[in-house]
Amino acid sequence: MHSLYLQALQPVYKAAHNEQEEIKIKDTQSFMYQLTINAPEEKGWTHEHILEVMRGNFKTLVYICMADEQGSCYHTHIFVVFASRVRFSMVKRYFEEAHIEKCKGSVSDNVNYVKKTGKWETDETKQEKKIEGTFEEYGAQPPDSKGKRSDMSELYQMVL
């Protein structure tokens, strides 16, 4: 009888265990995130409101830029940089409706994606979607060399 009870519980435990693992995997930490909000104005997500939510809830916010596009639906791309790592779940808490991704590439790569400049300028499909005059940024754009120590680079160059 005891083994039947354990067998009955096993699928529940596995499902709960897998959900916890999935949450752990998704709840990564990062200095930089890209967010996309579809139909932002219908949901009250103006650029001003986005900035207000970021400033009010993320004390380590260093830089944010955003721009609007018209694809299959109107949407806003947002790129944020924090001074310290922020959990995915924290960003999701305040931007539930947004598609959120941990950033790949440099700060400049991500800003260029939002602006549709750099390599994105030659992509006609992206240029057609860009809505001129909607790009906004707040804070100073961090350098691409995050994590590199200039004093160590100088020392290395002196040794060579």
Residue ranges and their predicted role:
Residues 32-34, 61-63, 77:
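Beta-strand-rich binding-surface signature
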Residues 71-77:
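The conserved glycine-aromatic submotif of the RRM
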Residues 1-58, 83-160:
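Catalytic "initiation/cleavage/transfer" segments centered on a nucleophilic residue
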Residues 58-71:
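Short, glycine- and small/hydrophobic-rich beta-strand elements in well-ordered beta-sheets
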Residues 80:
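Extracellular, beta-strand-rich glycan-interacting domains
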